[in-house]
Amino acid sequence: MSEQTVQASGQPTKARPKREFGKARPAEQPFRYPLEREYVEPDWRRIPGYRDVTKEQWESAQWQRAHTVKNLVEFKRALGDLLPEDLYADIERDQRERATMPMLIPPHMVNLMNTDDLWSDPVRRYMAPAFSERDPEFPSHPMASRDSLHEADMWPVEGLTHRYPTKVLAEMIPTCPQYCGHCTRMDLVGTDTAQVLKYKFELKQQDRWEAMLDYLRRTPMVRDVVVSGGDVANVPVERLKDFLFKLFEIPNIRDVRLATKALMGLPQHFLQDEVLRGYEDIVKRAHERDIEIAVHTHVNAAQQVTPLFGRAVRALLDMGYRDVRNQGVLLRGVNTTPQDLLELCFMLLDHAKVMPYYFYVCDMIPNAEHWRTAIWEAQDLQFAIMGYLPGFATPRIVVDVPFVGKRWVHMVNGYDRVKGISYWRKNYRTSIEYDDPEALTRDYPYYDPIRTLPEEGQAYWREYLAKQRGHELQPV
């Protein structure tokens, strides 16, 4: 009898199964690993403005801040002939007619650009965008707004956004060591541009911080605080310690996250002795209070992962910070192919020990349509990156839906692909919906970039805009 032997009693018993092996072998994959990209610090001396800069100067946070590029003239002075004249003129026009953020780029970030081809360089594209890169017909979506997530609407006190039931965002300061062109807080962060007069905090800084702490003491449902800005790297470390030590004394606070793009953009800041001592004091106090504390950073391109960044990350991890996590933004022309995303995630994970955490669909701020992706494109990207990274390090691609919050891109409740309108639901009320009986049953809309729509959908939005302009032109 097949696969059986017979005992002396005449009863059949199964034989031990045998398996053939050796037929499996590595297959060709859409993404190839290991990476070909080197983990190196680019030589800053290739850049004309930095040719005589010593290693000691380059690794000095004070030198980096003092020589940060603050305008296009300084950008040209740093890059010299590496910045093509036509690109200079294109960026200059963008600064006049489209930019929602001022230019502020530390030398370290300039050095991360591919100076052999600045036109196509992903870092330049989002730090110093050119006018010709913007969408020519729809630079802004008709539904775009300066505070696209309505964070200020959810301030119980100035600068503290209470959107989720148990979590808040503390906007400590309105400045960063570097300004990204796609900043979701363009209404608040940075100095004015030709297009945008920024909101200015009304309370004095210390009064604002004390009001935040007082609200948290009075609101025991909050357990999780994201300490952001701006960027915490622009908060003097002793002042940051003072705020955090008071925060740690609030019994309901169990998780704290410090948000800083400067960990990548200005790692020299985090390698200063006084900053290292301050951050070590912070994590020790958090552990004494049995509070989990982590750091969130913002890296969008694989070439931004360098040894200086890795040193700064390891210093924080060695102190006892739970994680350093990356929250990137999907930006067309920067990182919206599976190859781009996977290469970035492996560089973060393999070399810098940073956890790929989230990639956000770029928010609907003014003049950002050329960067934004459609929901279906984000869904395709999520599918394409599955299976390569460890499960715990596979980033979730999310959309931040106004009045809803983060949603995985596959959680859409309805989707009109022609008009590019997706619909989303939620299971909690924001802090401005406490008396709204329909908050948990309403469909909340989100909008794809118009250029990603079929012609019928684009025609719909052209007609919509024409009607809007008609209303604006009617006499009052």
Q: What do the predicted segments below correspond to?
A:
Residues 102-105, 153-186:
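N-terminal pre-triad scaffold of radical SAM enzymes
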Residues 180-182, 191, 267, 433-434:
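Short helix/loop capping segments that flank catalytic or ligand/cofactor-binding pockets
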Residues 2-162:
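Flexible, acidic/Gly-rich N-terminal and inter-domain linker regions that tether
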Residues 196-204:
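Short cysteine/histidine-rich metal-coordination sites, predominantly Zn2+-binding motifs
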Residues 119-120, 126, 203-214:
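Active-site glycine-rich loop that binds ribose-phosphate moieties when present
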Residues 2-20, 26, 378-476:
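C-terminal accessory extensions appended to soluble enzyme cores
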Residues 206-220, 224, 230-389:
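Conserved AdoMet/S-adenosylmethionine-binding subsite of the radical SAM
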Residues 185-195:
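Iron-sulfur (Fe-S) cluster-binding segments and ferredoxin-like electron-carrier domains
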